[in-house]
Amino acid sequence: MKLGISAYGAYVPQYRIKVEEIAKVWGDDADDYRNGLMVSEKSVPDVDEDTATIAVEAARNAIARGADPKKIGAIYVGSESHPYAVKPTATIVAAAIGAPNRMTAADFEFACKAGTAAIQTSMGVVASGLAETALAIGADTSQGAPGDALEYTAAAGGAAFVISKNDHIAVINHTCSFTSDTPDFWRREGADYPRHGGRFTGDPGYFKHVLSASRMMLECQGTKPSDYNYAVFHQPNGKFPTRAALTLGFKKEQLSPGLTCPMMGNTYSGASMVGLSAVLDIAKPGERIFVTSFGSGAGSDSFDITVTDRITEVQDLAPKTWDYIKKAKYLDYASYARHKGKINTDN
């Protein structure tokens, strides 16, 4: 039995702030961050946007690409920034897209890989027959404390994928995961901003898990990097996925179509999924996609995906990912702080 993606959609808020604008406020060297992180600007949610609205927009774009909301039997939303501690984002999405009441829904958390965990769970639910189709979403309005290095990259956006047994635009050939207890990045209940281990987030966190899961996938599938047309890795910045890709033997040409972070920042649970959406926007039938996510705490999910002939029928039915990214309105730091709730405007 083949499982795959039958529809997809992404959404990125239109507002941006440049690295220079943030650096100016904190007295930092913008070039150090731009070159060190390989990020020029990041997306910023509007004052009335949150993870729920982003998830809804991404889901609506997936519906526009041919998914029937009445056939969706499960909705899972992965995020680090669900708007409610007790009230699922997934039920908000279900109501907004007109999904039936006879369904299951849940919110997921696993740092930046909660969205790909939602894809894997959707695959299991569909394979078991409990749902005809399932909707998996990764979305975030990422947090970064004022003046922290995370503030240069923590962004907003998300992507949605409908998983089914039929009508695939892309077949998921295999998925596998690598997981360990690694405290590289965390946020306690009630805290406004996450804390992180600085450089500890690199080799012991990101690279150990991304490289291990990726090598596991290549070994399981008996493939090599040259067998794939595209490669997408979790992108907390532009530097990490580039290093991971080159270490594994992928080329920059395979990576660049899905490398969205340099122009929109790190969307946390949406990062690898927005990258996959960008690749599906341009992919051709028969092309193969390699995807590996990463979530602090820590774990990585890898996917081997083959695009089908149906992809050309749906690509132009909803806004494309890079169209969202290129549609930018720039903010100064004061406006950005208001949009992000860093300034309390309540009387």
Swiss-Prot record:
Enzyme active site: 80 (proton donor/acceptor), 112 (acyl-thioester intermediate), 234 (proton donor/acceptor)
Known partners and oligomeric status: Interacts with acetoacetyl-CoA thiolase that catalyzes the precedent step in the pathway and with a DUF35 protein. The acetoacetyl-CoA thiolase/HMG-CoA synthase complex channels the intermediate via a fused CoA-binding site, which allows for efficient coupling of the endergonic thiolase reaction with the exergonic HMGCS reaction.
GO terms classed as biological process: farnesyl diphosphate biosynthetic process, mevalonate pathway; isopentenyl diphosphate biosynthetic process, mevalonate pathway
Annotated PANTHER family: 3-HYDROXY-3-METHYLGLUTARYL COENZYME A SYNTHASE, HYDROXYMETHYLGLUTARYL-COA SYNTHASE
Family the entry assigns: Belongs to the thiolase-like superfamily. Archaeal HMG-CoA synthase family.
EC number(s) recorded for this UniProt protein: 2.3.3.10
Binding positions for CoA per the UniProt entry: 199, 239
Biological role stated in the UniProt entry: Catalyzes the condensation of acetyl-CoA with acetoacetyl-CoA to form 3-hydroxy-3-methylglutaryl-CoA (HMG-CoA). Functions in the mevalonate (MVA) pathway leading to isopentenyl diphosphate (IPP), a key precursor for the biosynthesis of isoprenoid compounds that are building blocks of archaeal membrane lipids.
Binding site for (3S)-3-hydroxy-3-methylglutaryl-CoA: 29-30, 112, 153, 201, 234, 243, 266, 296
Pathway, per record: Metabolic intermediate biosynthesis; (R)-mevalonate biosynthesis; (R)-mevalonate from acetyl-CoA: step 2/3
Record's catalysed reaction(s): acetoacetyl-CoA + acetyl-CoA + H2O = (3S)-3-hydroxy-3-methylglutaryl-CoA + CoA + H(+)
A single MF term (Gene Ontology): acetyl-CoA C-acetyltransferase activity
HAMAP family hit by this protein: HMG_CoA_synth_arch
Protein name: Hydroxymethylglutaryl-CoA synthase
SUPFAM superfamilies: Thiolase-like
Classification lineage: Archaea, Methanobacteriati, Methanobacteriota, Stenosarchaea group, Methanomicrobia
Alphabetized UniProt keyword annotations: Acyltransferase, Isoprene biosynthesis, Transferase
